[in-house]
Design a protein with these regions (language model features):
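Terminal targeting signals and extreme-terminal segments of soluble enzymes
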Residues: 1-76, 82-131
Length: 131
């Protein structure tokens, strides 16, 4: 497994009023939505045909909430590739507001044969696209 940390995607997140919960800060579930959107945008840059019989599957996701985010807010979400294995990769998601880290997420993605429901090695053409 290759271990390194390379920024692969960065996006601006505009917190919506509906992202708030009863306690007046962004609901914890919304962070996972932000992370998911960043992952999808990054995968789209790889120009993958996601209708194939193989592709990415999220097998683990976690978030550490460091500081509350309160509406209105504009955040920067920086996604990094943490490690790349035979059939899996680990992504880190760092969420910033005014240069302060607000939350840190991690996600494990496995390349899967959808018909066999089994993990497989990253195809060479995909591996070459991943920094």
């Amino acid at each position: 497994m290759t271990n390194h940390k390379t920024t692969i995607h960065e996006k601006e997140v505009h917190v919506a009023w509906g992202d708030m919960d009863a306690l007046g800060h962004v609901n914890n579930v919304r962070y996972f939505d932000y992370f998911q959107q960043a992952r999808i945008e990054w995968l789209e840059t790889l120009k993958l045909d996601l209708l194939q019989t193989t592709g990415p599957v999220v097998v683990h996701i976690a978030c550490t909430f460091l500081k509350p985010v309160i509406y209105p807010a504009t955040l920067i979400l920086r996604s990094s590739l943490h490690s790349l294995g035979r059939s899996s990769l680990m992504m880190d998601h760092d969420l910033f507001q005014d240069d302060q880290i607000m939350a840190q997420g991690t996600c494990k993605i496995v390349w899967v044969d959808y018909l066999k429901n089994k993990s497989i090695q990253f195809p060479d053409e995909i591996r070459m696209l991943i920094p």
